[in-house]
Amino acid sequence: MTAVTLAHNTMHSDRLSRRSAVVVFLAFALAYFFSALVRAITATLSPTLTDEFSLNAQDLGLLAGGYFLGFSFTQLPLGRLLDSHGPKKVVLAFLTFAVLGCLAFAWADSFTGLLAARVLCGMGVSACLMAPLTGYRRWFDANDQLRSNSWMLMTGSLGMLAATLPVQWLMPIWGWRALFVMLGIMIALAMVLIFMVVPLWRTTSTNEDPAAKVIQDDGSYREIWRSAYFWRMTPIGFFSYGGMVAIQTLWAGPWMTQVAGWTPTEAAKGLFLINLCMLVTFWLWGLMSPGLARRGIPVERLIAWGLPMSFVVIASLAWMGPSIGTGAAVGVALLCVSSTVVALAQPAVGMAFPPHLAGRALSAYNLVVFAGIFVVQWGIGLMVDAGLGMGLQKPAAYQMALACFGVCSGLSWVYFLLKRPIQA
């Protein structure tokens, strides 16, 4: 039995009509769009922030990773809150901190201020994906859950797309500080829409959820931590999924400028291409996932077959280094696109547990992913600085860091293959 088939435990009485489901999806998608824009904007702003605050590679990695550090801090309490109070109340409360974080970043006058604001932003938007996925677990059927997950990620890619050339174009007009003020305003508007259209959470649902009758839910993560399926998915979530996002949202830009020799404007165009490719890829996953499930092709098999393509691309990029030249954006795009199959692990983990545990299961796995993003983002920066300290040229230091990341990702895939696939 795969994780997808376990989704039939969903509470049918809570299903939304098609029209209501679309409206709710769009409201959550708007908030997630802005959260992804906030996440990815440091890749475009990295040359400006590096010059203005005299940042090195380690500082830049820590600054970008601060978002994910703040995100990780909230995941375990977030899961309990989602299961208890529902997506609407939780996401509105959390987004208040995101607005404050954007304003704090706009007025920061030191690296410490920037880092604190990024952590606050990360904490604030940390419910923007988990809240809707928890709601979809109850409101949508199994096929729509797979599709909506992919299309939420597509919306995130659209936000990352907006963080590239559009931000580059607005920089000479507004400056980066005004951009963050505007982001805070737009997130507040998304909060208003969520307040208006997202349904409240029904807490008295044990009549519809057979699992809730026999399990005395104490709000703990005990069932999650005991799940062999969860632990099977953990290393690939940490290294491959986390690494994909770390590269997409930070190190893609420096790879193009520091390794391939591109200008900041050329790198912004490259980031636009990368995120456009990611957007199209997640849209296609949303179209294909229900059909693949109906054909009996489980998520686990897709990951086992598909993820090795990313290792080939990582090895090629690390080997070619500066010689990739004008093909740098295409190479990084291939790396990110070939890694997207691992994103299917997240809804699979959520559907491997009964609905009353969905918020905790999804948040626990999201903690794994975002801890991976933080570690990979900062770790690559540390490796680059270590390589420079060893006397390597900057491109060679980046090549060494990417190769180390590739080895870690490959080992996580081997663990996934060898771990006995016991379901929750």
Please give the residue ranges for each predicted region.
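Helix-breaking motifs and short loop linkers at transmembrane-helix boundaries and internal kinks
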Residues: 54, 86, 107-113, 124, ...
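Cytoplasmic helix-loop-helix junction between adjacent transmembrane helices
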Residues: 117-156
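Juxtamembrane intracellular "pre-TM" segments in multi-pass secondary transporters
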Residues: 8-17, 201-234
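Conserved MFS/SLC helix-loop-helix module at the cytosolic interface between two early adjacent transmembrane helices
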Residues: 73-112
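Paired small-residue
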Residues: 97, 101, 112-120, 326-334
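Helix-loop-helix hairpin linking two adjacent transmembrane segments in secondary transporters
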Residues: 151-202
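Extracytoplasmic
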Residues: 23-57, 247-253, 376-380
